[in-house]
């Protein structure tokens, strides 16, 4: 709750961060990245590891924490954690879509690499690889494999927060 509260109070609900960065600031935090971080944090909190099924039941804090006692991890399941996580994920997704982010979905991407349909990846177990459905599936597999390296300037509007290796930043 502390991380989520801090993100809400200091980052998301203030005007410190913009929704998108210009090219020269690519890789720096945005409000969309903060919302995604909040959603990921709440997903972790809702997961079985931290929501009633912690593996080490005798793991305790040596010093009592105000409001929590000696327990570091909740041993009781709380369905509301999943509700909060779902709401945060929906908010982050909608904010990203509203800001212009979208999944890169160009199934003809393979052509930009000079490949022909018969050179698309072979998928073991695919019953009819050259049927319309089979080709669409093979194109999607190719897209998922290689589009992650496609730059924003080339039309990949999927990046929300990335690490850059530019020495100037």
Each language-model region and where it sits:
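Structured, solvent-exposed acidic/aromatic patches
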Residues: 1-168
């Amino acid at each position: 709750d502390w991380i989520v509260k801090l993100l809400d109070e200091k980052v998301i609900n203030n005007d410190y961060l913009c929704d998108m960065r210009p090219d020269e600031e690519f890789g720096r935090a945005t409000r969309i990245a903060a919302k995604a971080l909040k959603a990921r944090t709440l997903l972790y909190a809702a997961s079985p590891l931290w929501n009633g099924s912690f593996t080490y039941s005798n793991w305790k804090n040596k010093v009592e924490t105000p409001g929590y006692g000696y327990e570091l991890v909740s041993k009781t399941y709380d369905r509301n954690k999943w509700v909060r996580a779902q709401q945060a994920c929906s908010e982050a997704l909608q904010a990203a879509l509203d800001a212009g982010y979208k999944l890169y979905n160009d199934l003809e991407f393979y052509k930009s690499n000079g490949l022909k349909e018969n050179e698309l990846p072979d998928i073991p177990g695919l019953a009819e690889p050259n049927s319309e459905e089979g080709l669409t599936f093979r194109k999607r597999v190719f897209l998922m494999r290689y589009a992650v390296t496609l730059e924003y300037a080339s039309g990949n509007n999927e990046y929300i927060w990335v690490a850059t290796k530019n020495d100037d930043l």
